[in-house]
């Protein structure tokens, strides 16, 4: 193992195809494993820095590093698990161990974690890696969770929480979005799981439809967490509670780059609140102040009227999910939840304004929403190249028609 570790560190930046072709130069090195470790380390750099920085860890499956949680989302999930356990010591069974990143983060909060994985080589690597990371409260088991095995798995682990991140790729790497298409199938297993423990924490594709997923899972969904970081929606987490009979809460979370030292921006609501919320699109003589573009988590949550209502914002249009405020204090409050722009000018979207704006701001970012052209078409009409002179928006206002807004990031 020491030779492999040294080889990986020495060749971390090398061309992997060349290493494979020249494998005969290093007869005492398992080149397939070495290449997989190098691939994985490249993916883990900046994603799970503590793992990348530990030279003793091995990674036999490159795809696992690509699919594993980041440090930020791993920390968030472990904190959520602790809240599910009401802050008390808890036991957790991870039925989809994979690379082991989630199990490792859970182990920092849990009394004991049981890692279950169907691929033997991942289990061998996980046991080695957990020891190298001094994670002494993780038990590794090489087993697949099926209706035939789940009772034995949970009888041994005796968990307070079961965690599942079902594999979302089918044959040929095809992405799967429906719950029943993923492995293991939580729809098949959930009733058996509930006979052994009260709580299930389920991670789904961030592309999954929340309403459909919760409907398929039955009335036991207690909370839905949409977790975004780095401008991308990364995870969709569903907390299921065997004893829950109420409406589920949706929490949209934006994790800042400084998380966990910096608090996340979170916005919680129930669907019934969004249904009765109203957003003002009242007529105005001008559009001025600040423009707010909700982050990916809020957009996924679909709480478009509640955003306007809770933050006291004017919504440009029923189907245009951009908001305006004249308050600097409000603009500062909104920053963690998305992007805020200072409005320099607003004018009708027509040939004259397009020509004048393109000439005045030749290097600008461009966004088109809810108007009869897409972003690329508007960019070509403006004749601008990408740059930071301004950010030009083509947006539809219910009261003023199609607008051309010239803004700068606030």
Question: Where do the language-model regions lie?
Answer:
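SAM-dependent transferase fold signal centered on methyltransferase-like domains
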Residues: 1-410
């Amino acid at each position: 193992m020491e030779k492999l570790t040294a080889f990986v560190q020495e060749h971390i930046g090398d061309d992997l195809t060349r290493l494979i072709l020249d494998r005969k130069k290093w007869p005492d090195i398992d080149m397939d494993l070495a290449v997989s470790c190098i691939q994985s380390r490249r993916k883990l750099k900046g994603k799970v820095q503590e793992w990348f920085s530990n030279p003793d860890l091995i990674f036999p499956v490159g795809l696992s590093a690509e699919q594993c949680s980041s440090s930020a989302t791993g920390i968030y999930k472990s904190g959520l698990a602790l809240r599910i356990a009401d802050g008390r010591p808890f036991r957790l069974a991870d039925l989809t161990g994979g690379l082991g990143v989630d199990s490792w983060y859970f182990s920092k909060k849990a009394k004991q974690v049981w890692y279950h994985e169907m691929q033997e080589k991942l289990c061998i690597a996980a046991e080695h890696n957990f020891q190298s990371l001094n994670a002494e409260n993780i038990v590794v088991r090489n087993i697949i969770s099926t209706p035939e095995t789940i009772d034995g798995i949970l009888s041994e682990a005796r968990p307070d929480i079961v965690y599942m991140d079902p594999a979302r790729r089918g044959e040929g790497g095809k992405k799967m979005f429906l719950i029943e298409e993923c492995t293991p199938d939580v729809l098949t297993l959930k009733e058996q799981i509930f006979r052994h423990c009260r709580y299930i924490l389920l991670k789904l594709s961030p592309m999954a439809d929340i309403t459909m997923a919760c409907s398929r899972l039955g009335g036991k969904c207690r909370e839905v967490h949409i977790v975004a970081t780095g401008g991308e929606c990364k995870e969709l987490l569903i907390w299921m509670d065997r004893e829950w009979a109420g409406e589920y809460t949706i929490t949209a979370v934006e994790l800042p780059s400084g998380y966990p030292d910096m608090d996340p921006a979170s916005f919680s609501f129930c669907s019934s609140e969004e249904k009765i919320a109203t957003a003002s699109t009242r007529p105005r003589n001008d559009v001025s102040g600040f423009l707010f573009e909700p982050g990916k988590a809020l957009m996924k949550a679909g709480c478009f009227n509640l955003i306007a209502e809770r933050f006291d914002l004017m919504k440009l249009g029923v189907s245009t999910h951009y908001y305006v405020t004249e308050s600097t204090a409000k603009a500062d409050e909104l920053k963690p939840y998305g992007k805020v722009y200072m409005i320099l000018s607003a004018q009708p979207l027509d040939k004259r304004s397009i020509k004048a704006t393109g000439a005045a701001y030749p290097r600008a970012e461009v966004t088109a929403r809810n108007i009869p052209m897409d972003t690329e078409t508007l960019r070509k009409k403006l004749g601008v190249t990408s740059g930071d002179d301004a950010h030009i928006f083509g947006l539809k206002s219910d009261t003023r028609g199609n607008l051309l807004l010239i803004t700068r990031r606030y």
